[in-house]
From Swiss-Prot:
Compartments (UniProt record): Periplasm
Function: Part of the ABC transporter complex CysAWTP (TC 3.A.1.6.1) involved in sulfate/thiosulfate import. This protein specifically binds thiosulfate and is involved in its transmembrane transport.
Assembly with partners or alone: The complex is composed of two ATP-binding proteins (CysA), two transmembrane proteins (CysT and CysW) and a solute-binding protein (CysP).
A single cellular component GO annotation: outer membrane-bounded periplasmic space
Entry-linked InterPro entries: Sulphate/thiosulphate-bd_CS, Sulphate/thiosulphate_BS, Thiosulph/SO4-bd
Domain of life: Bacteria
GO biological process: sulfate transmembrane transport; sulfur compound metabolic process
UniProt family annotation: Belongs to the prokaryotic sulfate-binding protein family.
Entries under CDD domains matching the protein: PBP2_CysP (cd01005)
Molecular function GO labels: molecular carrier activity; sulfate binding
Signal peptide range: 1-25
Major subcellular site: periplasm
The protein's name in its UniProt record: Thiosulfate-binding protein
Length: 338
């Protein structure tokens, strides 16, 4: 019986080196929210260097995908093979379990602080000299004030804005729901443009010149102030505010299929390291490391934070009550059009 000698021919040295080089190269895709580009552009290179150092020179490349976090989660459910998610809303991570079983039910317990390596709150960006004299949420319902923030239907950023405004009004009105709804109707009526994501809202305010106040994460408004320094924007942090957590997770089914589980876990754990936490505060995000926050105290004004769960119940309840079709948001928008 003839033997096909070609099948038994050993690989050449060049071929073996090529295969070895391919085996050592790892690529991660980080699916993130719309306004995190600059943060991860700063975080990724030092981790890539640390990975090479810890893994015998193996090369790791981290690629980024950015959009509104809800749109990002939907893209993964539709087939985007992201290895890790770094979002600004718990529900946008949870849906990867609920709708796709891509992560386990207990994903939030796998990393510290409910898998949230950093957090933020809401800030107001006003034009030079604060011409509309904006200081707190109550100033945002005046008839002469025009607001810019994304659509809460598509943006986690905007959902926090909506809930922060509702919570502040609820506190001010002593829990009178009718008064809070009246406040929220005018608040939403004052929105000049609803963009789909936070970065679009930034462009509308800073480049198109629309609106008197841009509402976004404290981190985002501070970075915009620096980016557009010539325009003299000013940042206002209201007295009552919301705790906005930024949950992260490796996408189990994807990392197993991609062979990237080790790198994905190492990457997200590294976000809690002193090096990463320090970089994070440079971009005006708050962290749960008191030593690092103490060194950056001048960046972060004191504000009274409330948790979504304390004021509104669980996130599934929040989504059903406020943001589902026919929910409170839709009712308030309809009332504002009358």
């Amino acid at each position: 019986m003839a033997v096909n000698l070609l099948k038994k021919r050993p690989l050449t040295l060049a071929a073996m080196l090529l295969l070895a080089g391919q085996a050592q190269a790892t690529e991660l895709l980080n699916s993130s929210y719309d306004v995190s580009r600059e943060l991860f552009a700063a975080l990724n290179p030092p981790f890539e260097q640390q990975w090479a150092k810890d893994n015998g020179g193996d090369k790791l490349t981290i690629k980024q995908s950015h959009a509104g976090s809800s749109k990002q989660a939907l893209a993964i459910l539709q087939g985007l093979k992201a290895d890790v998610v770094t979002y600004n809303q718990v529900t946008d991570v949870q849906i990867l379990h609920d709708k796709g079983k891509l992560i386990p039910a207990d994903w939030q317990s796998r990393l510290p602080n409910n898998s949230s390596p950093f957090y933020s709150t809401m800030g107001f960006l006003v034009r030079k000299g604060n011409p509309k004299n904006i200081h707190d949420w109550s100033d945002l319902v005046r008839s002469d004030v025009k607001l810019i923030f994304p659509n809460p239907k598509t943006s986690g950023n905007a959902r926090y804005t909506y809930l922060a405004a509702w919570g502040a009004a609820d506190n001010a009105d002593g829990g009178d729901k009718a008064k809070t709804e009246q406040f929220m109707t005018q608040f939403l009526k004052n929105v000049e443009v609803f963009d789909t994501g936070g970065r679009g809202a930034t462009t509308t305010f800073a480049e198109r010149g629309l609106g008197d106040v841009l509402i976004s994460f404290e981190s985002e408004v501070n970075n915009i102030r620096k980016q557009y320094e010539a325009q003299g924007f000013e940042v206002v942090i209201p007295k009552t505010n919301i705790l906005a957590e930024f949950p992260v997770a490796w996408v189990d089914k994807n990392v197993q299929a991609n062979g990237t589980e080790k790198a994905a876990k190492a990457y997200l754990n590294w976000l809690y390291s002193p090096q990463a936490q320090t970089i994070i505060t440079h971009y005006y995000y708050r962290v749960n490391n008191p030593e690092i926050m103490g060194k950056q105290a001048d960046k972060f004004p004191q504000t009274e934070l409330f948790r979504v769960e304390e004021k509104f119940g669980s996130w599934p309840e929040v989504m059903k009550t406020h943001f589902a079709s026919g929910g409170e948001l839709d009712k308030l928008l309809a009332a504002g059009r009358k």
